[in-house]
A protein has these predicted regions:
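Alpha/beta-hydrolase active-site loop
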Residues: 123-150, 171
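Alpha/beta-hydrolase
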Residues: 70-72, 186, 274
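A domain-start/cap signature at the N-terminus of enzymes
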Residues: 17-68, 80-86, 94, 131-137, ...
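Hydrophobic beta-strand anchors of alpha/beta hydrolase catalytic cores
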Residues: 69-71, 99, 205, 271
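The feature captures the conserved acid-bearing segment of alpha/beta-hydrolase catalytic domains
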Residues: 181-265
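Active-site glycine-rich loops that stabilize anionic/oxyanionic intermediates
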Residues: 73-77, 277
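Cap/lid segment of the alpha/beta-hydrolase catalytic domain
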Residues: 103-133
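The conserved beta1-alpha1 loop
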Residues: 70-74, 209-210
Length: 314
């Protein structure tokens, strides 16, 4: 009799664990005839028409919970340009994740995301009161929209982006740790006042920054940055309750990475320096100063994806 009671009890525990795991997979796991490849999706958010570019990899299966990476463009750019510049679609096919590029709304004639810079910011003046938008909530709305159409592993949702998109990723880390498991800012630092950034959970990160970046400064506040990238590395480590000193975790030609490994909830905070790198996506030569500054010796997009996919939201 005791054995039977014990078996029933264990069965309830197992069923409960399976139910908990199932809750993290989206309703889109039941969707029929999913559209693969590239599409543009329009949604309404805060009474405005918004859109995002969606890429579903060739190997997508509707019964397999799939990670999602949201990849934000920089100021003056757009969703399609960011997809091409980062070459994330091809990485999605290799690594098996859904790739989304949100489209920013215009402010003063240029598409931009509200990463937190305001008229009061010391390094830049952006008056979002002229065109208000909550882009953190927009990102969360995108996650929910995708999750109704595709089979998402909702524990494996991530944010990356270039410049303003990198700053947006930091804001997401501050305000949406309940949705996003990790972030990968490129050439951007936190725009919010540090005291207003209070993540509810540890948020692992990998960040890339060039030492010759004149838009988002490497060593000190300047350009569009309220602080230098090196200072941001230390700040994010503190926000994630990291202990000790960073150690070198990658050394390549003109590219090196340091990591804090003893952080809350097993998070890793990683910072990659591109020697004489400009305001560029790592590994993508691009145009202008990026022909000289970007390192073609690494595939930054693959490094980002490999890092992000290690982590699940707790």
């Amino acid at each position: 009799m005791m054995k039977r009671v014990l078996l029933i009890f264990v069965s309830f525990i197992i069923l409960g664990l399976e139910a908990d795991n199932h809750e993290e997979n989206s309703s889109g796991c039941d969707a029929l005839n999913p559209v693969l490849g590239k599409t543009t999706v329009s949604i309404e958010h805060e009474g405005k028409n918004r859109s995002y570019r969606l890429y579903v990899p060739k190997n997508y299966k509707s019964d397999v919970p799939t990670p999602l990476i949201i990849n934000f463009h920089g100021t003056g750019s757009n969703a399609e340009q960011q997809a091409i510049y980062s070459d994330m679609d091809s990485v999605a096919d290799k690594k098996g994740f859904i790739h989304v590029n949100p489209q920013g709304l215009e402010l003063d004639g240029r598409p931009v995301f509200n990463a937190g810079l305001t008229m009061q910011s010391p390094a830049n003046k952006r008056d979002f009161s002229k065109a208000p938008r909550d882009d953190v909530d927009f990102a969360k709305t995108i996650v929910e929209d995708v999750s109704t159409k595709y089979c998402l592993n909702k524990k494996k949702v991530y944010s990356t982006g270039m410049s303003n998109g990198g700053r947006m990723s930091y804001r997401i880390g501050c305000e949406a740790a309940d949705t996003f498991a990790a972030i990968a800012p490129v050439a951007g630092v936190l725009s919010l006042p540090p005291e207003k950034c209070q993540p509810t959970k540890a948020v692992p990160s990998i960040a890339f920054h060039g030492t010759w970046d004149l838009v988002s400064s490497y060593k000190k506040a300047g350009g569009f940055s309220t602080m230098g990238a090196v200072q941001m590395f230390s700040l994010w480590a503190k926000k994630n309750q990291c202990k000790g000193k960073p150690i070198v975790t990658f050394q390549g030609d003109k590219v090196s990475c340091e990591s804090y490994l003893s952080c809350a909830e097993g998070a890793e905070i990683k910072f990659c320096t591109i020697d004489r790198g400009g305001h560029c996506w790592p590994g993508r030569l691009g145009f202008g100063s990026c022909r000289l500054g970007a390192s073609s010796n690494i595939n930054g997009s693959e490094m980002i994806v490999d890092f992000l996919l290690q982590f699940e939201r707790s």
